[in-house]
A protein has these predicted regions:
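Catalytic cores of the polymerase beta-like nucleotidyltransferase superfamily
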Residues: 1-467
Length: 467
């Protein structure tokens, strides 16, 4: 077996007085006939300092050396390489990082510390010979995910393996063995011992599992594994609560949870997190009223709680929450053109992602991949607006804020500009400087009248405080 290995790393293997092995994904993917990974894991019965010195001699610079775990990080030809000494790991029980390690010169012991047999096949970089202490080659041939030791033991050591199982099985198209599923299910609660940041990172990788080896709908398969192993109950209990909640059969073929999964299945990669969470408010709405009405409003708050708990980036959180709040707009397709025009301008910053979500939501109802009728209607309206030259952003407006001086009070400038944008949304031909200046004067006058009719509530209180 010959792997795609950087030249200087291969030379290092030939010069070393110990066998140097590739292990993990690089070997697994080569045996499975999958595209080569850029990252390479290597190992040997040698300590980190000895390997680091040899690497430096070969012209490969080590970026980090961790003597306690026998780990050396390198980069060569733009590829990341991680070396580890043969070792066995000891865990407190469920946490991702081992609490102690013991170095060994036995490849069998090193293989047993790994998670799945498909990741415990070794290739000697000098001879090209494959070493398979645990029968991982057969599992790769049969596209099976099996643990290196009893599944209960493997998952009880490191809770992150619960999510790695779902993600890697989905990426590879492998089927977890029954023992593996049962072991994961028995230890599902151990995911609570893993940091929110790691869970979120693994969830994102799973939601993009189809991209690793171009396996269509792989991410959907990963979500189903999270459901079957009940890991979903711990990382996203609000979503899992949708299991078994029936929906109107004239609109839906699936319960709330399965619909969320299928919406995510058909969603563009850029909005999959929003697709997964878009109906997360339905269980709460049903609990309150016995109906799903208002689940979009409830869902916005619940999605925010989830993403803050997972420590998702603020930008991602805001996008997902906005899309969740807006996804029900014009569901029945009865919104008037004037309303759609205003909506498209008000929500221009999330309009394209919202279209993607509405399409995925439509497809997820009855697995219908045709164009969502509401989107066809919206597209006709926005195409018309573009032909008219309607501005969708303040930058496209024919007047700037400084041009409203003397017409509009300075504190009201931002409000007036937004109103001008909506004014033009109804007829793009209005986007002319003179027309907008006249309209700005009218708007300013209306604001003054409103303020005169409804004085600020805080004014009497301020006067009392002055006395």
């Amino acid at each position: 077996m010959r792997l795609n290995i950087p030249k200087r790393l291969r030379q290092l293997a030939e010069q070393a007085d110990f066998p140097l092995y590739a292990v993990g994904g690089a070997v697994r993917d080569a045996l499975a006939g999958l595209p080569a990974s850029d990252d390479i894991d290597i190992c040997a019965p040698a300590d980190a300092e000895k390997f680091s010195a040899l690497a430096e001699k070969a012209g490969i610079r080590a970026s980090a050396v961790y003597k306690n775990t026998g780990t050396v990080l390198l980069e060569e030809e733009g590829r990341k390489i991680e070396f580890t000494s043969f070792r066995t790991d000891f865990y407190r029980g469920g946490e991702h990082a081992p609490c102690a390690v013991r170095f060994t010169d036995k490849i069998e012991e090193d293989a047993l510390r790994r998670d799945f047999t498909c990741n415990a096949v070794y290739c000697d970089l000098k001879t090209g010979e494959v070493c398979d202490p645990l029968g991982g080659q057969k599992d790769i041939e049969e596209r099976r995910m099996a643990t290196t030791r009893p599944a209960d033991e493997v998952f009880s050591e490191d809770g992150l393996r619960l999510m790695r199982l779902a993600r890697q099985a989905a990426q590879l198209g492998f089927v977890p063995s029954l023992e593996t599923i049962l072991g994961a299910k028995f230890n599902a609660a151990r995911i609570n011992l893993i940091s929110a940041e790691r869970i979120y990172a693994e969830l994102l990788l799973l939601l993009h599992a189809d991209e690793k080896y171009a396996r269509q709908y792989a991410h959907y398969e990963g979500l189903k594994i999270l459901e079957v192993t009940e890991v979903l109950n711990y990382i996203l209990p609000e979503l899992a609560a949708g299991k078994g909640l029936a929906q109107r059969s004239d609109f839906h073929d699936h319960d709330v949870l399965e619909h969320s999964f299928r919406t995510c299945k058909y969603a563009d990669g850029s909005i999959r997190l929003a697709a997964l969470l878009h109906d997360v408010g339905k269980p709460a709405a049903y609990l309150q009223t016995g109906r799903y009405h208002g689940h979009d409003v409830l869902g916005e708050g619940i999605a925010r709680e989830i993403l803050q708990r997972l420590k998702a980036p603020k930008k991602t959180t805001e996008l997902v929450c906005r899309l969740t709040a807006l996804h029900m707009y014009d569901l029945d397709g009865k919104a008037r053109e004037s309303k759609i025009r205003a909506f498209a301008v008000k929500n221009h910053d999330v309009y394209e992602p919202l279209l993607l979500l509405k399409q995925a939501d439509y497809s997820g109802c009855k697995d219908d991949l045709s164009l969502c009728p509401t989107i066809a209607k919206w597209n006709a309206v926005t195409d018309k607006m573009k032909k008219e030259g309607a501005p969708f952003t303040l930058r496209e407006l024919a007047v700037r804020g400084d041009e409203l001086r003397g017409i509009v009070p300075a504190p009201e400038t931002a409000k007036v500009l937004q109103k001008l944008l909506l004014f033009c949304a109804q007829d793009g031909r209005r986007n002319q400087k003179e027309t907008l200046l006249r309209e700005a004067a009218h708007i300013a006058l209306e604001i003054q009248r409103e303020e005169a009719a409804h004085p600020a509530q805080g004014q009497p209180k301020e006067k009392e405080e002055k006395r």
